[in-house]
Every structure is written in structure tokens, then in C-alpha cells.
UniProtKB/Swiss-Prot annotation:
Belongs to the krueppel C2H2-type zinc-finger protein family. This is Zinc finger protein 573. GO terms for biological process: regulation of transcription by RNA polymerase II. One of its GO terms (molecular function) is DNA-binding transcription factor activity, RNA polymerase II-specific. It is found in: Nucleus. Gene3D superfamilies: 6.10.140.140, Classic Zinc Finger (3.30.160.60). The keyword Acetylation does not apply. PROSITE patterns: KRAB (PS50805), ZINC_FINGER_C2H2_1 (PS00028), ZINC_FINGER_C2H2_2 (PS50157). Residues 28-100 form the KRAB domain.
Amino acid sequence: MFPVLEPHQVGLIRSYNSKTMTCFQELVTFRDVAIDFSRQEWEYLDPNQRDLYRDVMLENYRNLVSLGGHSISKPVVVDLLERGKEPWMILREETQFTDLDLQCEIISYIEVPTYETDISSTQLQSIYKREKLYECKKCQKKFSSGYQLILHHRFHVIERPYECKECGKNFRSGYQLTLHQRFHTGEKPYECTECGKNFRSGYQLTVHQRFHTGEKTYECRQCGKAFIYASHIVQHERIHTGGKPYECQECGRAFSQGGHLRIHQRVHTGEKPYKCKECGKTFSRRSNLVEHGQFHTDEKPYICEKCGKAFRRGHQLTVHQRVHTGKKPYECKECGKGYTTASYFLLHQRIHKGGKPYECKECKKTFTLYRNLTRHQNIHTGEKLFECKQCGKTYTTGSKLFQHQKTHTGEKPYECKECGKAFSLYGYLKQHQKIHTGMKHFECKECKKTFTLYRNLTRHQNIHTGKKLFECQECGKAYSTGSNLIQHRKTHTGEKPYKCKECGKTFSLHGYLNQHQKIHTGMKPYECKVCRKTFTFYRNLTLHQSIHTDEKPFECKECGKTFRRSSHLTAHQSIHADKKPYECKECGKAFKMYGYLTQHQKIHTGGKPYECKECGKAFSRASNLVQHERIHTGEKPYVCKQCGKTFRYGSALKAHQRIHRSIKV
């Protein structure tokens, strides 16, 4: 079908003479054996014919290089084929010269010294390149080969007689104009028989159909990931090599793809050209708009064969399947941690580099990802575009709505193999598993405290800086995190949509309900290795462990008093502030903390949901029940370091320690 150039065919096809130099007297070039296609012609080739074309063209080029050496310049079509791009833009459609006189009219030769006719092909070509013999008469630009000049000359001579009446853009062919006009009309005449999706051109349909057939001929040698296009694998391999040739002139950030740079630049310009027709929300990326649109339709066409879970996008299914296979192709060279997706891997690397290029203009908080900045900004605007159809509750992001919807279905497909606890999201399971491994990669430089999650470290660091950027507009109270502010706002509205089916107690957050329900089940999976005491919650275990170490990392800047918990420090600081923003509606008594108010309100309601299983005594607080149970168990966890005496309560130990201090005095 296509001519393959044999090595012995390479040679001089015309003798060289400086005085009577005729047009294109040079070596047999790649152009002599190349076959060119227009875009329209290319669409009629089936995939096997296209693969054959690529193989033949690349082999021809390799044969030329093997004889001509490195001095042979890479033709444009070869560069395109190697990068997985389609070759319809090559010379044939644009300038198909058949008359030598026409070719000579656009070429002006520069006088060069005389060479013998038996000069070697390599020497002759290197002379051509060094001397740049071909000059454009239009702009005087010089080129080392006639082919390069002809390719350049197309920009001067190509006619574009077909004009779009909508926008004035010109095209070389009526076919190109027809394709372009479909952007204005929205016409998509090519339909996929598999899924019914429509496309503007046959080429787009052919590309789309590969997603149904699963055809992926280009495989990454590093991680085994396969791609439909060679250009995609070139972009992907930069993840492994770290190559980032595209740099932003605004902030200096570099990218592996030019398209990523263009999208990134919208962060600086604020451009969001893609608008949702349903809710009016705008996006900087078309892919984000498409993903967002599926929240309105609730369409999930991609289904996991292992567990039946459905996804909106094909790549989400691919990533999900790694949960079943355990595959983590992206490994951090700094700490050895593996990731299922490149995006998580790149995000993790910023932890080591400390890069947070995205800053909120309202509160100056910085973020590693732009999408995290946009989500955060909703805290200031209060915008909530995603509504639950079950209960009408709204959320700032689609992912939060997705998480919330599982509270109605009760779906928890991800189970911990260590303790059997189940989770609604795979990310929650991964976080939970760190409790069993005890891994704490993230250390606070101020107090050396370590954390299993990076976000917990960043929250903790606000204790040292004292930053409280999120202020309640009702009472003026400030918080170090937006989530704490959202929780606090519910104290003013009194909203408690989550109800315990066991005792009827209601909660403002679903997480609080989950914590509360563990009291009824009696499960205490977290055990102290020092005294074997067990706890319902991991945070209670960590708090308890500070009793053994006597660690109190949280210090009041006013009086120097130290505390085991940041919440205790916050409660203490209200003593210095002398503010009591929380008032009881029954009797008017005011309190410094919301927790004190809720405790007080039980006096009026008489609610005592926590009952002792031994004697039936009821308590208004779970902590009071725990203290009471020590009477039955005989447990005395508080030990005096001076004399070894043990106590049931921390307050009793403190009172006892005063005896030793008074004796010393």
C-alpha cells in the first residue's frame, strides 16, 4: 500500500554543479518517499491502515537516518507521528506543487563554492544545513532544505477563500468551514451506536469508539498504564521523569503539558468560560463542567464488575478498581508512600516541598490545589449549590453531597480487615487504617507532636500561631478552621437534623451521631498499651495517654497554664476574655462555652440518657457515667508519682497532691 525505502536506494539523484544548480538537486529525501493525507482522506482509513501508515513512515525515516547520520533533520510528519498526532495537516492539502518552475519561483539560491560531483551525501547535506541555501523571497528568511522553505512558504501563498459568516474566520476548504460551522449551530451528525452520543465529525466519533472497544496500544514501561494515543503516553511519562517544560510567567510554576499551563493561567486571570445551564455555576475547565453536570442528571454509566458500584466517569472507575487490585503505581521517592492516582501523588509531593501557591484573598489561607481554594471560598460566600433530594440539605461541593447521600442509604462498602469497622468512602477507610499501623508521618516543628493526616497537622499549627481566621457574624467568635465555624453556626440556629434511634437524642452533625451511637453498642476498640484501658474513640485514647506521659503541650499565653487538650485551653482562655455569649433561653443564665450551656439545659429538661448497666443509675453526661462505673469495676487510673497511691478521678489526685506540696512547705 505504501512504498518502503530500502537503504541501498539512498544516494544522489542528480549531480551537483554550483554554476548550473537546478531546483531540488539534493539527496533522496524523506519527501521523495512520503505519502501525505488530508484530514478528510485520513478519516476514511480504518485503524489498521492508520497503524500501517505510521509503521511505514517511521521505518522510512529510520532507514534515512541510519545512512545519513544525525545530520538529517526530522520531518514534521515524523515528529507528529511520534507524538501520536494525526498527519492531515502535512503538505499535500496545503501546497501540492507539481510544476518545477512554480517551485523555483519561490526559491532564491545563495551562491556557494564549487564541490566535486562525487562529494559524499553526508558532507553535502551538512553543507546545505550550514550554508542555509534556501531563501524566501517574501520575507528573506533562510532555510537549510527546499522542503522546509516550501513548508514555510505556505503561510504566504495559501488561499483561504471560505469565510464563516458568524465569526469571520477563513478556511482553506469547504469541508473545514462545514466542520467549524457546527460549533455555532451545535450540529452533531455522527452518532455512536454503542451509547448514542453525537459528534461533530467522523474523526471525533472514531476516537470516541476506542473507549468502548478498550483499544489502548501505547503502554507505559514504568507503571504499565495504557493509552489510546501516543501523545497521551508522552504526557503521562513526564509524571515519572518529572519533565515540566511549560512555565507560568506569573508565578513560575511549571507544567508537563501546555494545556495544563493554559488552564492554570486562568487562576491569575479569573477566567471561567464554561457555564452550567442548570444552576449558572462557572468553571475554568470544560471537564469540570461535564463532571458537575452529572450531579444534576445523576447519570452513572460506568459500573464496577467486582462490587457493582457505579461512576460518572470512566477514569473514576479505573481508579476505583485499584481498591480491589491493591495497585499503587505512583510511589514517592522521598518517603516510599504509594498512590493509586497521579493527582494524589503530585499533591503529596507538595507536602515535602511545602508548596501552597493558591491564596484566599479574604483570609490569606493558602492551598496546595486550586480546587481546594475554590471550595474554601464558599465558606466566605455561603454559596451552596448542591441540594439533597431526600432532605433538601444543601452543600458547597458535589463530593460533600455524595457523602451525605450515604447517610440516607446507610451504604458502607469499605470494611477494615483489622477491626471490621465499615466506611462509606474508601478515603475514610485509608485514614482509619493508620490508627492500626500507628504511622504518623507529619510532625509539628513547634512541639514535635506527630499526626497521621497532613490536614490535622495544619489545624494543629493554628494553636501555636493563634490564627483564627473564621469569624461568626452572629456573636463574633473566631475559629481556626472553616468546618469549626460551620459547626458553631448551628448553635445559633439550633438545627439538629440527626436523631439517634436508640434514645431519641438529636445532633447537629452526622459525625456526632455516629460517635454517640457507639455508647449504645458498647464497642471500645481502642486500648491503652500502658494500663489496658479501652476507649470508644481514638481521640479519647490519645487524650488518656497524656495522663501517663504528663504531657501538656497547650499553653495559655496570658497566665502560662498548660493543658492536655486544645479544647481545654480554649475553654480556659474564655476566663481571661470574661465573655459569656451563650445564654439559656429558660432562665437567662449565660455561659462562656456552648458545652457548658448544653450541660446546664439538662437541668431544665431532666434528660439523663446515659444509664449504668450495673445499678441502673442514669446520668446526663457520658463522662459522668464513665466515672461512676469505676465504683463497680474498682478501677483507679490516676496514680500519685510521690507515694504511688491511686485514685478514681483526676480531681481526687490533684487534691491529694496538695498534701505533698504542703508537707514540703
